[in-house]
Regions:
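Amphipathic, Lys/Arg-enriched alpha-helical "gate/interface" segment within cytosolic domains
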Residues: 1-131
């Protein structure tokens, strides 16, 4: 079920699978990026999400200020959730790939659950849904 729908992002919850899918649709400015990330955190708390999929396939560049915000502000809240798996669908955009590589390099030492990268949603969902 879709719980958030904007031109730049959507969030779907599959409650029976304890799964959240945050899908990006092109470029998001700082306000939009942070709004969607914070909404996903809120929904994860509300629905006790265990598996998180970041679908970045169509996402564009992430500004440096938003990368810093993700590491310093968003990550501690994400770590406080009961997430057991995080699947990331890699963007087709080279600038997004560079931003994600930089952010994940800073985040990975703090993560206590598996993170895997995928090319498509179906493969990511199959991995996330496996025990």
């Amino acid at each position: 079920m879709i719980h958030f729908q904007q031109p730049y992002a959507s969030i779907e919850i599959e409650q029976d699978k304890s799964l959240l899918i945050l899908t990006w649709h092109g470029f998001a400015n700082s306000e939009e990026y942070r709004e969607a990330q914070n909404k996903a955190l809120s929904l994860s708390r509300q629905y006790n999400i265990h598996c998180w999929i970041s679908n970045m396939k169509d996402m564009k560049a992430i500004r440096q200020a938003d990368q810093d915000w993700s590491v310093n502000e968003w990550l501690p809240q994400f770590l406080a959730l009961n997430i057991r798996k995080w699947a990331i669908i890699i963007s087709d955009d080279m600038f997004n790939q560079m931003a994600m590589s930089s952010m994940m390099g800073k985040m990975r030492p703090h993560l206590t659950h598996p993170v895997e990268y995928f090319q498509d949603l179906n493969t990511a969902k199959n991995w996330a849904e496996r025990a």
